[in-house]
Amino acid sequence: MILQTGQRTDIPAFYGQWLINRIREGFVDVRNPYNPLQVTRYPINQEVVDGIAFCTKNPLPFIPLLNEIVDYRQYWHMTITPYGTDIEPYVPTYASVIEGFKHISKQLNSQSMVWRYDPIILTNEYTVDFHCESFYKMAQALKGYTDTVVVSFLDIFDKVVQNFPEGYRPSLDIQTKIIKEFVSIAHSNHMNLKTCGEGVIFKELGADTEGCLTLDCYESAWNIKLKAPKRAPARPECNCYLHGDIGAYDSCSHFCRYCYANTNRAVVRYNRLHHDPNSSLLIGRLSKREIIKESTEKSWIINETVTQDSLF
């Protein structure tokens, strides 16, 4: 199985030691977000976990812990955007995140690193020209450290409406203009540009619309073949294989205004007060009321050819 860590929160930024403790203990407990008393227990060992998928805005706190997971294949999605504190209040400067990206890429390989420039948000300050210039500078800085960049436009989920009411999706004409320019920049820096959750409308512009976190992504990065259980897509326009996430909603303190995973800051702060690095759960501890279901996951590898390089 692939251990997912980034659909609900940012574990490398805020909960790295907790993850390392779970790996040392050999299992992790995950609450069902819709039924908190229902808990799934996933084993964490190399016989079952084929790799760990990360999605983060700030890898820097986790870098000192990377030696602890050197024996696991890794696949990183790292969001690097040019927004200020008006939109991303507690995300480090993009220059520092780029350095973190490069550091990890050097230890793994460029195929295991994905740069996310999303969501694309337009305001009076963050104009089309601003985005094109920012994307160009970042692409040049990341050239050779990744072969993939993922982009998308703002999705208007309920929590986004609540926390970012002025957010909107630009017209299709403007989206097309941006994607066309981004594809050109990406290709000139030896990157494949993928769209996330945008359907196939940008395929004719040269964008890869086949999904940004598919089994093919893992297979290409890790030089293996996988056979995974069939899963329904998270939404109709998404081809990604999302499974086994160990995070929890309402626990990310980046407080990005466009976030779909946080209700509000008060809930996040309350939950973080109940985080224990030694707990089997990300938030809180087990009581006697939970029903624990042991996961029956197994390795998905059917033909391993080459293991992921590591220079640790």
Q: Which residues are covered by each model-predicted region?
A:
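Active-site beta-loop-alpha junctions enriched in small/polar residues
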Residues: R8-D10, K57, T79-Y83, D118-L122, ...
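A generic local structural motif
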Residues: Q38-R41, Y136, G244
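Surface-exposed cleft-lining segments at the edges of enzyme active sites
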Residues: Y83-V91, P119-D129, N163-S171
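Conserved C-terminal portion of the radical SAM core fold
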Residues: S96-Q162, K180-G197
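A conserved mid-domain beta-alpha-beta active-site/ligand-binding segment of alpha/beta enzyme cores
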Residues: V160-P165, R169-G244
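Local cysteine-cluster metal-coordination motifs and their immediate loop/turn environment
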Residues: P236, G244-N264
